[in-house]
Amino acid sequence: MSIQDNFRLAMRRYIYSVSIMSNRDLNDNLNAITVSSVTSISMNPPSILICINKSAKIHDSIVIGSKFCINLLNKDQQQLSDLCSDEDRHDQRFLDKNWNTNDIPFLSNAQANIFCKVDKLASYYTHTVVIGLVEDANFSETISTLTYVDGKYI
């Protein structure tokens, strides 16, 4: 097997929380994508890192100064995760009644919402590393986070 195959199989052993990154682009279009590569960077200033594939529809809407939300999903939101990872169903992503789309789109029933402003972008081969400054955050008191390992939700 190639190093890429071995690396992919090794990474499948990690358990990831599942989130949806959502934003509104400069033309007022709503975007959302399922992401598992979300990491806190610092508490001072509060900041977060997300990796987005350059081929994703949302990619070009992520620019310095733009705003986005990381919606940490709960165990009941597996179907929404699947929907937001399917480029062919992009037009269906905001049909869920729990989306608040007044400003930065966010899921009102998510485990947590982390509202950010893009501070830095770093291109790295197939992906862009997005560094966001956290402007606000809220969370549910009950912890029931949707997780993913070895190609399956748990």
Which sequence ranges carry the predicted segments?
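Basic, polyanion-binding surface patches
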Residues: 1-154
